[in-house]
Amino acid sequence: MAARNWSRVWVGGTVILISFIAFSSQIFVIWPWYGREISLDLLKLLVPLNLAAFMIFWNYRLCVITSPGSVPEGWRPNIGAMDGMEVKKGTHTPRYCKNCEHYKPPRAHHCRQCKTCWLKLDHHCPWIGNCVGFYNQGHFIRFLLWVDIGTTFHLIIMVRRVLYIAEYYHQEPTLADVLFLVFNFATCVPVWLCVGMFSIYHVYLACGNSTTIEGWEKDKVATLIRRGKIKEVKYPYNIGIYKNIKSVLGPNPFLWLWPQKMQGDGLSFPVNPSAGDHTTQYFWPPQDPSRLPNPPPIPAHASPFVYGNNGFNPNLQPTNSLRARRSSTPHIDEDEHSHERDQYRHYSSGEERDNDSISTSSSPKPYLSDYDHYDEGPMYPGERMTALIPRVRRGSEGWEVAPGGGWNAYSGMMDEEVGWDDEVGYDEAPGEGPYVERPWEMRGRYNVYDTEEESGYAH
């Protein structure tokens, strides 16, 4: 109930703001300027201004009262049509809403404000007290564009009035003229700037047949591809600028600014053939395999060494041990330290155990940077063992250049200069005082099997 009341406040405030800008300028600025008499010049100003105001109110009303489109009761994805589709297990699954307890059609999302799932949800807009979705997205974009047109024309009239006062300064304006000029500039300029930028953004989304939420999804998918978590995929709904705009504003370009009903049911959408067949839409966006309940296992037989022609082994599975250990084993003592080293002693640098608690799986495609790592903040003492987990470096698999004495001396000087804690440094040599390891200065971050020293630790 409280949310509904606040929604009415937002809508009422928006109506008052539009009315003030549209009518106060006509009554207190334009009408006195033309001597309070009907003339052709006056009509040239009032007719376009009132037409823009009418279209703003009309589209705003449609935005408020038009439902974005709810998910039909009992709707389920056409699983039978997906049998012939090759789908990567675990990273592509039909979408399901736990709050509403039903499957979600393509592009549908759950709104926490409305507490329901809407078709092709873009965002929840407090200014209209409604969500922007499939059935009212066109009304919303038209509303923004008409606000741009109306405020631009309004500002042109106000600027002309100011220039007239400056040119005919002997005709002193009344106090009401000055006050309402100031008020109109103070209200119209911020609206023109804010709505203008918002309009540019939503027109850009319409040209790409995307929504605000899908823009975030595409950024997330691009990050997963760059880190090698998933294979490269294409956004399936971009079918060309002209067709994209037609799908939102209607088939006739001459009526794009005229209110019209959205075509389609919002349950399925045309798909770009280069992205796959029509079933591709049921599996967008692909999920992060490392966040699934049962992530795919890591093959123990995979070798990291390069193939011929400067190619990499397609079975190579770089891991991110730091994130996996933080989520599963927050603290490791010295006994576990020695156990981990024994665990990996008989494995070469490219062989990794099939153990989900140690590492997460990622794709070996060429979208990784030099290191598959995440910037998660400082390394804490309980995470020192993460340096011993095998990690893969592109172009130099199985090799490590250990830092020499010059680096140790230089790093000691830098520690004193920047004031690092004893918790992560060598204050004194072993046996002479506090001794804590530096993970980045430890040998053996790549474990190599040594046949001559089978009883010793891996280097």
From Swiss-Prot:
The protein's matches in Pfam families, at most eight in alphabetical order, are given as: DHHC (PF01529)
Residue ranges spanning the membrane: these are: 10-30, 38-58, 139-159, 178-198
**On the Lumenal side, which residues?**
31-37, 160-177
Entry keywords, A to Z: Acyltransferase, Endoplasmic reticulum, Lipoprotein, Membrane, Palmitate, Transferase, Transmembrane, Transmembrane helix
Q: Does the keyword Lipoprotein apply?
A: yes
Q: How does it sit in the membrane?
A: Multi-pass membrane protein
- The record's region (Disordered) falls at 278-379
List the subcellular locations.
Answer: Endoplasmic reticulum membrane
Annotated DHHC domain residues: 95-145
Top EC class per UniProt? transferase
Task: Name the active site residues.
Answer: 125 (s-palmitoyl cysteine intermediate)
- Provide ranges: composition bias, Basic and acidic residues: 331-356
The chain's Cytoplasmic topological domains, given as residue ranges, are 1-9, 59-138, 199-459
Q: Does the keyword Acyltransferase apply?
A: yes
Q: Which PANTHER family match?
A: PALMITOYLTRANSFERASE ZDHHC16
Q: Which family does it belong to?
A: Belongs to the DHHC palmitoyltransferase family. PFA4 subfamily.
Functional description taken from the UniProt entry:
Mediates the reversible addition of palmitate to target proteins, thereby regulating their membrane association and biological function.
According to UniProt, the name of this protein is Palmitoyltransferase PFA4
Specify the species: Cryptococcus neoformans var. neoformans serotype D (strain JEC21 / ATCC MYA-565)
